[in-house]
Amino acid sequence: MSNIEQQVKKIIAEQLGVNEADVKNESSFQDDLGADSLDTVELVMALEEAFGCEIPDEDAEKITTVQLAIDYINAHNG
């Protein structure tokens, strides 16, 4: 597991109040982890802050799973 993947999963677990072991790559924020739209917005903001990047709203709407978040950060980080 990459460092970015570990960080993303940790942030997701903290933001959504779930056990980090329950955060799987294929997990949907809403369907599997119980996030609502506000949780998702706060999660995107936490990812932006942690990785020093800006995630435009149109991209944020497409980030619906843990793997999509990891892929986005990998593609846009640094």
Curated annotation (Swiss-Prot):
Keyword Coiled coil (UniProt): no
Single GO BP term: lipid A biosynthetic process
Record-stated family: Belongs to the acyl carrier protein (ACP) family.
Entry's localization field: Cytoplasm
Domain Carrier: 2-77
Protein task: Carrier of the growing fatty acid chain in fatty acid biosynthesis.
Record protein name field: Acyl carrier protein
One Pfam family per UniProt: PP-binding
Record-linked Gene3D superfamilies: ACP-like
Post-translational modification: 4'-phosphopantetheine is transferred from CoA to a specific serine of apo-ACP by AcpS. This modification is essential for activity because fatty acids are bound in thioester linkage to the sulfhydryl of the prosthetic group.
SUPFAM superfamilies, per database record: ACP-like
Pathway assignment: Lipid metabolism; fatty acid biosynthesis
Positions in coiled-coil regions: none
Keyword Cytoplasm: yes
GO MF entries: acyl binding; acyl carrier activity
Annotated Gene Ontology cellular component terms: cytosol; membrane
UniProtKB keywords: Cytoplasm, Fatty acid biosynthesis, Fatty acid metabolism, Lipid biosynthesis, Lipid metabolism, Phosphopantetheine, Phosphoprotein
Residue(s) carrying O-(pantetheine 4'-phosphoryl)serine: 37
Source organism (scientific name): Neisseria gonorrhoeae (strain ATCC 700825 / FA 1090)
